[in-house]
Curated annotation (Swiss-Prot):
Keyword Cell membrane: yes
Lineage: Bacteria, Pseudomonadati, Pseudomonadota, Gammaproteobacteria, Enterobacterales
Gene this protein is translated from: atpB
PROSITE patterns the record matches: ATPASE_A
Membrane topology: Multi-pass membrane protein
Organism: Buchnera aphidicola subsp. Acyrthosiphon pisum (strain APS)
GO molecular function: proton-transporting ATP synthase activity, rotational mechanism
CDD domains (UniProt xref): ATP-synt_Fo_a_6
Protein's cellular compartments: Cell membrane
Protein name: ATP synthase subunit a
Subunit structure: F-type ATPases have 2 components, CF(1) - the catalytic core - and CF(0) - the membrane proton channel. CF(1) has five subunits: alpha(3), beta(3), gamma(1), delta(1), epsilon(1). CF(0) has three main subunits: a(1), b(2) and c(9-12). The alpha and beta chains form an alternating ring which encloses part of the gamma chain. CF(1) is attached to CF(0) by a central stalk formed by the gamma and epsilon chains, while a peripheral stalk is formed by the delta and b chains.
C-alpha cells in the first residue's frame, strides 16, 4: 500500500497521518478513514512506542546505576552523569522549595520527551513499511509526541501535581484565597479574580501539551510532505538539512517541557510567606 500511495501524494500523506487504532467496544483494528467514535478508540502505535521508549530509558539508567564506578567512568556513564548534572542544575536554579521528587521527575520528563521526539528522525516509510508487510497492519505512526493525546496526557499529569502541591503547601483555604484574592486583593473583585486565575490555571496544561504537539506535528508533516511530493532524487537535499535543524527542535522542545514543569511546580510550592 505504501508503494502504491506514492503515485497519489494526497493518499500518501493521509496514510502517514493515520494512527493504528483499536475500537475499545469490539477490540478490532479500525481501518484508516473508517468512521468511528473517537471516545472509544485508542491510538495503539502512540501508546506502544511511548511505553517502549520509557522502558528503554529506565532500563538503561538502571543498568548504568547498578554498575556505576568511582574510578574512570565509561562513555555511557559519563553521558548520563552530564545529563543528570544538567537537569539538576536547572532544578536548583528554578525550584525554590525542597522536594526530592522534582529532580527525578524533571530528568524523566526531559529524557522521555527527548526520546519520543527523536523518533521523528527515523525514515518516514521505515516502520509503516514493516508494519504493513510483516504484521499486515493498516497504519503506523512512531512519534508519540506528535499525538495530541500523549502530550496532553503528560501535561495533565503535571497539572495534577500542581494541584496536589498547591493544596499540600497552601491548604484548601490558601488555594481558594489564591483563586479569589489575586491579582486584586479585595472581595469586590472576587468573581473577576476567580475567572482570571481559573483561566490561568487551566491554560497551563493546555499550553504545555499543545506547544509540544504543535512543534512535533509540524516537523513530522514537513518530512511527510518532502517524501510525498518531491521526486526521490531531490529528497536528500531537503531531508538532510531539515533533519539537522530538527535535532535542535527535538532537544529544545524536551528542554522547554522540562523547564515549564519545574517552573509550574515551583510556583505551586511557594507558600504565602515566600
Amino acid at each position: 500500500m505504501i508503494l502504491e500511495k506514492i503515485s497519489d501524494p494526497q493518499k500518501y500523506i493521509s496514510h502517514h497521518l493515520s494512527h493504528l487504532q483499536i475500537d475499545l467496544r469490539s477490540f478490532k483494528i479500525i481501518q484508516p478513514g473508517a468512521l468511528s467514535s473517537d471516545y472509544w478508540t485508542v491510538n495503539v502505535d502512540s501508546m506502544f512506542f511511548s511505553l517502549v521508549l520509557g522502558s528503554f530509558f529506565l532500563s538503561i539508567f538502571y543498568m548504568v546505576g547498578k554498575k556505576i564506578t568511582q574510578g574512570i567512568p565509561g562513555k555511557l556513564q559519563t553521558a548520563i552523569e552530564l545529563i543528570f548534572e544538567f537537569v539538576n542544575l536547572n532544578v536548583k536554579s528554578m525550584y525554590q522549595g525542597k522536594n526530592a521528587l522534582i529532580a527525578p521527575l524533571s530528568l524523566t520528563v526531559f529524557i522521555w520527551v527527548f526520546l519520543m521526539n527523536l523518533m521523528d528522525l527515523v525514515p518516514i516509510d521505515f516502520f509503516p513499511f514493516i508494519s504493513e508487510k510483516v504484521f499486515e497492519l493498516p497504519a503506523m505512526r512512531i512519534v508519540p509526541s506528535a499525538d495530541i493525546n500523549i502530550t496532553l496526557s503528560m501535561s495533565l499529569g503535571v497539572f495534577f501535581l500542581i494541584l496536589f502541591y498547591t493544596v499540600k503547601i497552601k491548604g484548601y483555604v490558601g488555594f481558594l484565597k489564591e483563586l479569589i484574592l489575586q491579582p486584586f486583593n479585595h472581595p469586590v473583585f472576587s468573581i473577576f479574580n476567580f475567572i482570571l486565575e481559573f483561566v490561568s490555571l487551566v491554560s497551563k496544561p493546555i499550553s504545555l501539551g499543545l506547544r509540544l504537539f504543535g512543534n512535533m506535528y509540524a516537523g513530522e508533516m514537513i518530512f511527510i510532505l518532502i517524501a510525498g511530493l518531491l521526486p526521490w532524487w531531490t529528497q536528500c537535499f531537503l531531508n538532510v538539512p531539515w533533519a539537522i535543524f530538527h535535532i535542535l527542535i527535538i532537544s529544545l522542545q524536551a528542554f522547554i517541557f522540562m523547564v515549564l514543569t519545574i517552573v509550574y511546580l515551583s510556583m505551586a510550592s511557594q507558600s504565602h510567606k515566600d
